[in-house]
């Protein structure tokens, strides 16, 4: 019986080592070069109405030309992507209202979180929206909800080769 304890301990340590190494998998650490597919948090995941949820993580997203950014939307947010050259200070923010709706230079606009879900969608507040970036450039991404943008909910997608 005394021989079983060290044997079981050794098996447990080996199993834990295999489990930990499989969790790491392939981390694709290639020195920060852009990838073809990137996943981004759009909303901090708190699903609250406060500024703590008004984040896009990371703030600068790197993707290869012809790549896709998958925005994991958490909460009441709407993605607006602008053509290269548009800056946060260029956004025409109305003095009041729920949404900004600046269509000048708009490249992509996501699902509206307001009202009932569109046909075929079960939930427009917690979802994944994938955006294809066919050309190089620095694209501005904002939350189209006025107060969220004013709280700093924007980021950039840098498309490179």
Where are the model-predicted features located?
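Bacterial N-terminal signal peptides that target proteins for export
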Residues: 1-9
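Bacterial N-terminal signal peptides
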Residues: 8-18
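Sec/Tat signal peptide C-region and signal peptidase I cleavage site
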Residues: 20-24
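Extracytoplasmic copper-binding redox domains, predominantly the cupredoxin/blue-copper superfamily
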Residues: 25-161
